Amino acid sequence: ARRRHSMKKKRKSVRRRKTRKNQRKRKNSLGRSFKQHGFLKQPPRFRP
């Protein structure tokens, strides 16, 4: 999305980059929650 009216760029607040370990942990937790909530146990027509 391109800002049309404001020509002045807003500086993003500089944050520390998260490490790969955090990405892996987040991905694993998401997979675990999927399994817990039973998305994989639904009938096949609901599967992506």
UniProtKB/Swiss-Prot annotation:
GO terms for molecular function: DNA binding. Testis. The keyword Nucleus applies. GO terms for cellular component: nuclear chromosome; nucleosome; nucleus. InterPro entries: Spermatozal_protamine_typ (IPR012601). Residues 1-29 have a biased composition (Basic residues). It is found in: Nucleus; Chromosome. Signal peptide: none annotated. It comes from the Eukaryota. It holds the Pfam family Protamine_3. Residues 1-48 are annotated as: Disordered. One of its GO terms (biological process) is sperm DNA condensation. Keywords: Chromosome, Developmental protein, Differentiation, DNA condensation, DNA-binding, Nucleosome core, Nucleus, Spermatogenesis. Protamines substitute for histones in the chromatin of sperm during the haploid phase of spermatogenesis. They compact sperm DNA into a highly condensed, stable and inactive complex. Two isoforms exist, a major form and a minor form. This is the major form. This is Sperm protamine R3 isoform 1. It comes from Hydrolagus colliei (Spotted ratfish). The lineage of its organism: Eukaryota, Metazoa, Chordata, Craniata, Vertebrata.
